[in-house]
Amino acid sequence: FEYWDAQVDDSRLVVLNAQQAAEHGADVRTYTECVALEEGKGHWIVTLREASSGIEQVVHAKAVVNAAGPWVARLLEKLFAKKPPLDTRLVKGSHIVVPRLHCGDQAFMLQHTDGRVIFVIPYLDDYSLIGTTEAEFDGVLETVHIDEDEIAYLIEVANGYFKRQLSRDDVISTYSGVRPLIDEEGKDATKVSRDYHLEPHKSAVPLLSIYGGKVTTYRTLAEDVMKALAPTFPKMGAPWTKQAPLPGGNYSAQFGGKNGELQSGRDAKASAEDEATLSALLSAQAPWLQVSLLKRWLQTYGTETQTLLGDASSASDLGMHLGADLYSREVDYLIAHEWARNPDDILWRRTKLGYLIDERGKAVLADYITTVRAAAAKGAG
């Protein structure tokens, strides 16, 4: 049988939501930890610590949302020095990336011998993404990684269906994530609910902790959080995110929409046509730009590609070549607009160029970022 589903780059989705929040006045702090939370008169006294400098700052908040994911219960225990009201059950899922197993843009849903379903999904242009596993996790969250038995498990199911047989040497990359589910004693990990739960803290000032949830429901989850906090913010407006494109996705504003809102009835075909229109416009504006680079920029940044391209009038305006098709102009953009601070931010969290850039390129990129950040710090001082 055949059905339709959606695919998203989760790390870029997070960044784009942060960008949209900043556009609406949010103060976005990356690499910043909440180290203390004290209840004051009508507000929380929040102590924040910046990771690289260790500098602490105290801010006041009318409400706090604990959206720490798998750290949700640990954070509560750390801040209040007592066991949180709900326990979390951590379930790890891992994926492997291998050379492309099949042609076409369809994904495959395979059933393993244990009855579990595994997906094989076209990934970037040259790879297949295989996953996910599912297992209880009691390790160190900061160093979560795939186990060899998980790799063997995923290879086994793929080899049971595809003519091209995989070996351990075919695994190009791996990644693992941990779901913070509510602990339902006695239930197998595969049976525990994936639904989200909002748990209010017993305090006069609102503190809401989020348990569970998944990327497909993140927006409605956020709306439910805001609904719960509405009494604290009486001037809060009506929900608006359903019809609001994320940064880079406002094609309808340029090609027939109004007020930056999505046009009702616009489908994937219309969006693809809009992207093709913008691609043609930018190709005419910058005929010197490599077709493959423009394609990647459009897929990654959408309409923000125009901001990235800016007033560049030749290939030399792209700046230093840092490996693959990464130039310093893009790195500067990511530092200025997407809070990138280190090579992993650039190569894995904002793009997926980590698959293409060699160790020398990574070292050159690290040196460049260090130089840019040092110059920025000197200028700020």
Protein language model features and the residues they cover:
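C-terminal catalytic lobe of FAD-dependent flavoproteins
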Residues: D10-R12, Q20, F80, P85-L90, ...
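C-terminal amphipathic alpha-helical interaction region
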Residues: Y355-R360, V364, A374-G381
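General small-molecule cofactor/ligand-binding pocket signal
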Residues: D27-R29, I172
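Core beta-strand elements of the Rossmann-like FAD/NAD(P) dinucleotide-binding domain
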Residues: G54-A63
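Rossmann-like flavin
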Residues: F1-G25
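Flavin (primarily FAD) binding-site architecture
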Residues: N66-A81
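A conserved short coil-to-beta-strand element within the FAD-binding core of flavoproteins
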Residues: T30-W44
